[in-house]
């Protein structure tokens, strides 16, 4: 009988996780959030990540935008940060701050931290 290795894509090894697996655990790949959690926390983390779809999508979209388009008008189009202000119109705490309107990486990191908070892996700063 020939051993066939299961082909794993780039998804997180945690069952049902919507994130990409970017950290090796010695054979399987997990996302940064499951890497921070103990295995008994994985179902709760997965559920929180799935529930935060708008934040996950926003992170992916922010990563695709160049720094110039993010912070200033280009060819008559408004700065891209305005799209995210509108996306989170009902959640002003998730809109870009004044500093993040200039530095998109700061905004991306804050959204990533928001996912960690929602997954119970980080605490909100007061």
Task: Show the residue positions of the predicted features.
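Intrinsically disordered, low-complexity regulatory regions of eukaryotic proteins
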Residues: 1-126
């Amino acid at each position: 009988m020939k051993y066939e290795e299961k082909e794993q894509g780039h998804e997180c090894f945690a069952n049902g996780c919507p994130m990409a697996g970017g950290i090796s655990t010695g054979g399987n790949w997990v996302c940064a959030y499951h890497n921070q959690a103990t295995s008994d926390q994985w179902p709760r983390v997965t559920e929180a990540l799935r529930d935060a779809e708008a934040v996950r999508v926003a992170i992916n979209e922010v990563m695709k935008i160049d720094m110039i388009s993010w912070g200033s008008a280009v060819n008559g189009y408004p700065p891209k940060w305005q799209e995210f202000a509108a996306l989170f119109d009902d959640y002003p705490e998730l809109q870009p701050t004044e500093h993040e309107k200039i530095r998109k990486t700061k905004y991306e990191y804050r959204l990533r931290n928001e996912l960690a908070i929602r997954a119970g892996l980080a605490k909100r700063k007061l």
